[in-house]
Amino acid sequence: MLERTLRVLEYNKVKEQLLEHTASSLGRDKVKHLVPSTDFEEIVEMQDTTDEAAKVIRLKGSAPLGGITDIRSNVKRAKIGSMLSPNELLDIANTMYGSRNMKRFIEDMVDNGVELPILETHVAQIVSLYDLEKKITNCIGDGGEVVDSASDKLRGIRTQIRTAESRIREKLENMTRSSNAQKMLSDSIVTIRNERYVIPVKQEYRGVYGGIVHDQSASGQTLFIEPQVIVELNNALQEARVKEKQEIERILLMLTEEVAVEADIVLSNVEVVANLDFIFAKAFYAKRIKATKPIVNNERYMDLRQARHPLIDPEIIVPNNIMLGKDFTTIVITGPNTGGKTVTLKTVGICVLMAQSGLHIPVMDESEICVFKNIFADIGDEQSIEQSLSTFSSHMVNIVDILEKADFESLVLFDELGAGTDPQEGAALAISILDEVCNRGARVVATTHYPELKAYGYNREQVINASVEFDVNTLSPTYKLLIGVPGRSNAFEISKRLGLSDRVIDQARNHISTDTNKIENMIAKLEESQKNAERDWNEAEALRKQSEKLHRELQRQIIEFNDERDEKLLKAQKEGEEKVEAAKKEAEGIIQELRQLRKAQLVNVKDHELIEAKSRLEGTAPELVKKQKVNVKNTAPKQQLRAGDEVKVLTFGQKGQLLEKVSDTEWSVQIGILKMKVKESNMEYINTPKQTEKKAVASVKGRDYHVSLELDLRGERYEDAMMRVEKYLDDAQLASYPRVSIIHGKGTGALRQGVQDYLKKHRGVKNYRYGDMGEGGLGVTVVELK
């Protein structure tokens, strides 16, 4: 990618904003070396990786990247035998903790069902060095000091030091509090000079205390003397401090050697967390600019929906739909210089550069972008003073370079093509240059104010005109891109609004040919028509989204209602079975009691006693069944029953569907989610009218709700989606649908492939195919049922 292209499209400014979201110098280093890729597979993977990080941010709000620092140079020094300082070792421990914490964070999310395959692969490379981490933190405190507990020897030495210091202070403080001290001392304090305890003695009393003079005041009137009585104590203290220093060095060398042993693992972990910092910086930046993941294709076309420039405040910028590469390969944006054409040009360029860098781009969902091997841009006034080149010459130098390198894998951006010279010659050159790059198969967006290029857009098959809308009432551009409508100068309208007389304007119109006036009027009508069409489309789109939302809500309520009903039915059946079981047990108890009475001949069971026992037995029948008891006399179905018929199960008052006959008098019946055996005498045949193909929805046999002709799986997890497909196909078959549609979206294709793999194995599927253009294309699978 040309450095000049990155500069004029302000790629580095995007990187500067991205830098603000890194958590460490490791991530910042990755951002500084970021350049757009030209490898399709790599770009797709980078986009998927950024998308996973964005998912983590949506679910968790942030990622635990704190405490990570660039420790690579310290680890390399440890490998060659240098002793690391306490702070350097502490940085290594903190980074090891940070990498371990990040690994646990991602793995916990995965364990909780969040799909993060790429991030999971990244953190799987992190090797926990918990033992080394704890050794360092056990020896070095948060402030970077080696703690007493680092070794028993160090603890003992420091105990000696504290004892010696206490004895010295005690002796010196007694001296400063003596009656003679007031006249002999400059101040009643104990201080330190050259790491030895001293007191401030006046010059004239230097011989009173004996000992060693370590320092004097600026005036020379005060001497800092170590009295003779504490010289030996100070010597002992210094010896203890030397031992302390030696023990600290031994501990630091020991820890450094431990780091050296694990150096390769530590460096590998650092590289992983550097990548994670970089990845999450891209995700945080996407959130900041309200960007989305584009669909990356290798078919050389782009479809940017509501595209915005990332460096312009999203509250003031006007988003635009920009398509290139399908119906046309070149867009020529015409109109006055004040219309924001250059912003549109730069928006296309920077979106492509960002996408090829793995960054999400400021567009709406489902936007598509392709991969270009080269991006060329001739934008702005970059005349060279050193080379004494004019504006025109400077542009032409760039254009010559572009024409030498552009091919069918290139995106070429021209700003004010042909400007800076005679208008007629400039327009002619612009047309020839556009022809040249178009013939090479490049994708081109060019801006110009030459009216001759309006005709060029109509005369070339792969070229389309466009313009940036201008509001003559406010005398300012709206920055709305109108594809298919060439630009107008609006000079007469602007002049009139600014107060120029009608007489002068009319005279000016007379100097313009009739054909030109007709063209301008035609363009004005095209602008108005397009604005009206776009307004109508936006209103229709809003209504469609509202309808879809209502439809989803109704479907949710229906599903909840039926799930609740089925749950209650299942609960009622379970309670009924429990009551029947209890009745059987009580009946067995009654019978056993009668047998024992007879066997023991304790009681002569008479008729009235048997009647009473029978009454008790009947009284144990389930209350549910008794309440729902129906007179089945004459209710046995008169019509010959067949599998698939719809019946009413009288015991439960529910509709069901006959599955198969299991005996002469019993059928297997599907009631909602339940399958049970039911006697023919407990059924009532239902004569259901045939469904017509014109109806949008149909009743599912045996159920009290409707099934849609479409199943929308977009946004579903894979496992949940497959369960919904299975249930939906069963319901659709029960409803006798000949054909249904499953909406899975385009996306990465994983869900689409999963649906079609399932359809291959389903016994009820006769055939399936992708949707036609009017049915949703590759985002929909149309299923034909048996």
Curated annotation (Swiss-Prot):
Q: What does the sequence similarity comment in the record state about its family?
A: Belongs to the DNA mismatch repair MutS family. MutS2 subfamily.
- Tell me which UniProt keywords the record has, alphabetically: ATP-binding, DNA-binding, Endonuclease, Hydrolase, Nuclease, Nucleotide-binding, RNA-binding, rRNA-binding
The protein here is known as: Endonuclease MutS2
Which GO molecular function annotation, any one, does this entry have?
A: endonuclease activity
Q: What does this protein do?
A: Endonuclease that is involved in the suppression of homologous recombination and thus may have a key role in the control of bacterial genetic diversity. Acts as a ribosome collision sensor, splitting the ribosome into its 2 subunits. Detects stalled/collided 70S ribosomes which it binds and splits by an ATP-hydrolysis driven conformational change. Acts upstream of the ribosome quality control system (RQC), a ribosome-associated complex that mediates the extraction of incompletely synthesized nascent chains from stalled ribosomes and their subsequent degradation. Probably generates substrates for RQC.
Organism of origin:
Bacillus cereus (strain G9842)
Q: Which GO terms describe its biological process?
A: mismatch repair; negative regulation of DNA recombination; rescue of stalled ribosome
Which annotated residues bind ATP? G335, P336, N337, T338, G339, G340, K341, T342
Record Pfam families: MSSS (PF20297), MutS_V (PF00488), Smr (PF01713)
Enzyme Commission number: 3.1.-.-, 3.6.4.-
Highest taxon in the source lineage = Bacteria
What region holds the Smr domain? 711-786
Assembly mode: Homodimer. Binds to stalled ribosomes, contacting rRNA.
Give the matching SUPFAM superfamilies: DNA repair protein MutS, domain III (SSF48334), P-loop containing nucleoside triphosphate hydrolases (SSF52540), SMR domain-like (SSF160443)
Q: Where are the transmembrane segments?
A: none
Query: By which gene is this protein encoded?
Result: mutS2
